[in-house]
Amino acid sequence: LTGGEPLVRPRMPQLVEKLKNMPGIEKVTLTTNGVLLKDQMRDFARAGLDGLNISLDTLDETCSRRITRRDELGRTLEGISEALKYPEISLKINCVPLGIPDQDLCKVAFLARDHKVHVRFIEMMPIGMGKEFHGVSEEELLGILGEKLPRFSPYVGEPLGNGPCHYYDVDGFSGKIGFISAVSHKFCGECNRIRLTSQGFLKTCLQYAAGRDLRAVIRGGGSDEELKAVILEALAEKPDGHAFGGGLEKQKDDKTEKLCMAQIGG
């Protein structure tokens, strides 16, 4: 469950509980900025939430205000602290390196030393507002982290999820450091993701605006079988891969998605 910000939706824990009780649903996770998490965390635990991904791009207050245009870093950290009280719920921190000097990515990484959390660095994808940032490739990021972090080596244990992230063990760390590098390390061949936006639009690839309007099918009186057929059509037309190229250069052509990730759900 992504967003925008899913916790602004009323009765979100109740939705999680309903999803958990549906046949065929194996796991329910939620991505949030954490601002509204503290007061809802107990309810999510009772609902059976399996995992939390909390977006945190920096621990610097000034930098956080510039990125988010809000002064809410303290509330996000309170949400993380509350989530740590429920070890049965997998907790991951999502950080998007933006190529700005005061983001202090190493400080974010050290959260995995001090707490039982996995910190994942997600490469900026040049869609929506992401086209305006240079971003940081995985190789650049490994160099930055290598200057301050202890020795780290590829993690070879049991999978820590069903997505594209690959992880590293770091000496003395409680959690792992992970990388989701869609541009510099293209993984489209293993992609197992589709997204349903808050407007009911089914997207099969983040780069492209193509997909299916499921809300229109439902509001048009479509049956469950008709809805299933539309979903299967969309899956059959899922692109082989994105065309961002091998670098993180700005992409301004008409092929890329115009919406930002908050509008798509991420």
Q: Where in the sequence are the language-model features?
A:
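Radical SAM/AdoMet-radical enzyme domain recognition
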Residues: 1, 5, 9-122
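Auxiliary Fe-S-binding modules of radical SAM enzymes
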Residues: 114, 124-127, 131-266
